Amino acid sequence: LIREIKTLPEKIEKILKDKERIQWFASKQVNAHDVFFVGRGIDYAICMEGSLKMKEISYIHSEAYAAGELKHGTISLIEDDILVVGVLTQSELYEKTISNMLECKSRGAYLMGLTTFGRYDIEDTVDFTVYIPKTDPLFATSLAVIPLQLLGYYISVAKGLDVDKPRNLAKSVTVE
């Protein structure tokens, strides 16, 4: 684990080399009204962080959903041009999540996929892909949230919003 931790800075730098592509993609999403993030297992937790950042700084309605729950009502919200971001960092859940994303695409959704390098077959399914380096599953969240945070950041910048002072947010401090 210690060896893997030592590789994280280099892996983060590799992700940041893709920030211009993420910025370009974000500039195309400035008029989005809804963004849905879908994933399974730990990817669902990553989706919750991505959705939170999207809401907090871009003021776009955003929700995170467990991909396996899409058929329980959520799928009825999918319509033309809604952005659906699929997080697919776990190889054992990859095919199931892709299947859920295809259901969204069949209803007109615009798909972004976030997966690990080497999973280039995703480009046959999604409209835009961001890759992260493979890492120990314990650290996947540390890498996967970066492109999602950048997406929210660059959408906010493209909208002319002050990302350093989001409206209606306050820091919480507990004094005992």
Model-identified regions with their sequence ranges:
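A SIS-like phosphosugar-recognition module
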Residues: 1-176
